[in-house]
Amino acid sequence: MESIVWLLLLSPALVAGSLHPRIDNGLAKTPQMGWNSYNYYSCSPNEAIVRSNAKALVDLGLADLGYRYVTTDCGWSVADRLPNGTLTWNETLFPSGFPAMGKYLHELGLLFGVYGDSGTKLCGSPPDQVGSLYHEEQDAKTFAEWGADSLKYDNCYSDAATNYPNVNYEPSTSPRPRYEIMSSALARVGRPILFQICEWGIDFPALWAPALGSSWRIGNDIIPEWRSIFRTLNQAVPNTDFAGPGQWADLDMLYVGNGVFSLPEEQTHFSLWAILKSPLTIGAALKDDDTSINQASLEVLKQKDVIGFNQDALGVSASLKRRWSDEGYEVWSGPLSGNRTVVAVINWRDESRDLTLDLPDVGLQYAQVARNIWGKTVVRDVRTSYTAGVAGHGTMLLELQGTIPSGLYPAKIFAKSTDQKTTFESIYAATTSANYELAITFSRPSTETVTITTSSGQTISISGKSGRIALTAGSNTITIQHKTPIESIQITPPTGTYYANTVFNVTGSAKHTTCGSGCSPVGSKIGDLSPNSNAYTSIPATTVGSKYLAIDYINNEVAFSSSWGWGSNSRNLTVSVNDGAPVRLEVPLSGRHSELFSPGKGWWDTATLGVLTSGWKKGENKVVFGNQGGEDGFQTYAADFVGVRILD
């Protein structure tokens, strides 16, 4: 059976194959792990700092867990090259030199990471430090001669058309050609050097970076504020299915251990970076003359299960499955090797509470084992849902084993039988509908007529093995009167009816626009939904109750320049039924093309998220999409609205 998760939560763009040609140098078969100086020491590293932190990787047992790349970020170089044109280090800060640094790291069993820039100067200038622009071939050879194992390659002072400013988030040309040049130069040095592309997500590098390097930054820098976690995850949503062996979406370095986040926040940060298959780069001061990492944060970084999710051989990123904006939580999930599944339920509220995972939201109906990683508990025989306490800003991180796909209910797990009556419990319904398809598998061939009673109050008789039944959104029971023993039942949700934006009327500033080849599946959308406007239509329903809506939206509010402050890359979108209370979604980014140079600038790329709406009546229903709450601090304009599938 096609999973309801596939039906409701994946846009056509995400279903299509998206692993682009990738560099094939044998590196980064799993996401790289290590330590970088920037998040704690900014652009002020020195030899003693790097060496002491590198030794701490070994002494604290982190190197044995895979943290091996040690990178000195900005602040290591000087303003001028040597007379022969080669790069050199700041001899005051690094008196032994970079070749000696590489030798020291290699003797510790670690890997030597260097940092460069595709512009005229390194980030962090002034004081000026020379970049690699127009010197790529020479610098690649120099890095190799020093014994470098990786290169983080930044994007400052790089836009010639605007006289090489420190930062330009809207350059006149793509950063791609500069990264192609360095990638080619590295390929010729005769030494494997892992290339980390760090151009901040400009020009949607997921489309081209995998052919050049082993990882690409998806967005602007993480900042030492909790809100940056939500912003980064929103940016990650359209990148997740590009990840794979040798090509990883980089969510930026970790702030775990820097005294910025609470312990639950650090667990959330580390969990999501891990399951999205981001490189795991420690940004904390592990050990120097003045400080050392606290034990609780160290235990987060050393959590072997979470590291195992990141380094899993299957190499598939988790993706966003559901988001409840008003309720303040969301669900991410992805497959692991060994037929396992990892699930993260994030509690965005700053209060502890119980949260429930409905397994069908991640494509499952049953788990033989549920391991709660941070809760340190193991539960067996999980049927349809799992509930646990989650700390404020914390995450319920689960490893599910021995799973059954959603919609399949084996009698030995879900049913109780007496004589010729079998009652199935924990039957999940995403929507209230009389159009669910029930298929019965008997233990032996049978053509008998059976009587079915559902908890919605329906009683029907069906001949053969299948029929249509009514279920209510939530948990249901089904009782079957029969003679032949039942092995299992399978329930398929209704496919529903799709309503394109073109059948909606608009008010205020809202307007219909066409999209060239984009805005799948209809080629148009409604944009400019401000708080004083909406899109409305009348939609028929065959039953009373709550209905699941799969909403097609577009958002490419990348918010590069505003991300340093309170800038948000989510967009508000609300839906109300029959003038009832609106259900609100803060939708993440959907753009999967360049925000600068593609025909639609990423605003033609459709994604899908689902919500459950109440207040439906039999017959015609007034359905309104808008931007309620936009006047209260959410985005001035809602996400663009493409269409909606109503499951009735």
Curated annotation (Swiss-Prot):
Name of this chain's protein: Probable alpha-galactosidase D
Subcellular location: Secreted
InterPro entries assigned: Aldolase_TIM, Glyco_hydro_27, Glyco_hydro_b, Glycoside_hydrolase_SF, Melibiase_C
Cysteines engaged in disulfide bonds, as pairs: C123-C156
Residues that, per the record, bind substrate: E199, W200, G201, I202, D203
Keyword set includes tRNA processing: no
PANTHER family found in the cross-reference section: ALPHA-GALACTOSIDASE MEL1, ALPHA-GALACTOSIDASE/ALPHA-N-ACETYLGALACTOSAMINIDASE
Superkingdom to which the source organism belongs: Eukaryota
Active-site residues, as the UniProt record annotates them: D154 (nucleophile), D221 (proton donor)
Residues bearing attached sugar chains per UniProt: N84, N90, N339, N505, N572
Purpose of the protein: Hydrolyzes a variety of simple alpha-D-galactoside as well as more complex molecules such as oligosaccharides and polysaccharides.
Native species: Neosartorya fischeri (strain ATCC 1020 / DSM 3700 / CBS 544.65 / FGSC A1164 / JCM 1740 / NRRL 181 / WB 181) (Aspergillus fischerianus)
EC top class named in words: hydrolase
GO biological process annotation, one example: polysaccharide catabolic process
Keyword Iron-sulfur: no
Protein family according to the UniProt entry: Belongs to the glycosyl hydrolase 27 family.
Catalysed reactions, as listed in the record: Hydrolysis of terminal, non-reducing alpha-D-galactose residues in alpha-D-galactosides, including galactose oligosaccharides, galactomannans and galactolipids
Taxonomic lineage from the root: Eukaryota, Fungi, Dikarya, Ascomycota, Pezizomycotina
GO cellular component, one term: extracellular region
Signal peptide extent: 1-17
EC number in record: 3.2.1.22
Major localization class: secreted
Keywords for the protein's UniProt record, in alphabetical order: Carbohydrate metabolism, Disulfide bond, Glycoprotein, Glycosidase, Hydrolase, Polysaccharide degradation, Secreted, Signal
Annotated GO MF terms: alpha-galactosidase activity
